[in-house]
């Protein structure tokens, strides 16, 4: 067993090339094989770009209300306590609802790959604001 101290967690603003709007990320690192672990705060209306993960992703909504969408499907509303499973290489996005903050924990497995996210184009306002 190892404990990774919260004092070693780096907080940084989410990069503009990955997000629309303002986000803050707490990045925890664990030795490989392992996973990427991120706590992300999305301000109202903020969201990721479309993206994929080679080994999928798990989101746990800590607080607030958000939105998530798989390419070709309807926008879904996500709430405090919800867990979202995203399959490997599934094109998707996620973020806060238009009028509320949302915080989630993102777990990106990296057992057979480097776990790198493939960041794609921004989510249009039309896609983001589609009825959830």
Where are these regions (language model features)?
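Conserved strand-loop elements at the edges of beta-sheets that form or border functional pockets
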Residues: 30, 52, 60, 78-80, ...
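A short, N-terminal "cap"/entry segment at the start of jelly-roll beta-barrel domains
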Residues: 1-35, 116-132
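Short, conserved beta-strand element in jelly-roll/cupin
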Residues: 41-43, 52-68, 107-110
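Short acidic-glycine-tyrosine-enriched beta hairpin
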Residues: 72-88
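Conserved short histidine dyad/triad with adjacent acidic residue
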Residues: 36-53, 88
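A short hydrophobic beta-strand segment most commonly corresponding to one strand
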Residues: 58, 85, 99-119
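Short beta-strand His + acidic residue motifs that chelate non-heme Fe in jelly-roll/DSBH
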Residues: 48-50, 68-69, 91-98
């Amino acid at each position: 067993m190892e404990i990774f101290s919260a004092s070693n967690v780096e907080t940084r603003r989410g990069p503009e090339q990955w997000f629309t709007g303002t986000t803050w990320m707490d990045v925890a690192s664990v030795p490989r094989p392992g996973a990427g672990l991120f706590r992300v705060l999305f301000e109202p209306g903020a969201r990721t770009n479309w993206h994929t993960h080679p080994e999928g992703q798990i989101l746990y909504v800590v607080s607030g209300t958000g939105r998530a969408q798989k390419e070709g499907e309807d926008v879904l509303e996500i709430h405090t306590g919800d867990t979202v499973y995203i399959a490997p290489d599934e094109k998707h996005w996620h973020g806060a609802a238009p009028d509320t903050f949302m915080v989630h924990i993102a777990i990106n497995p990296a057992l057979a790959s480097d776990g790198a996210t493939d960041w794609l184009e921004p989510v249009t306002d039309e896609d983001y604001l589609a009825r959830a």
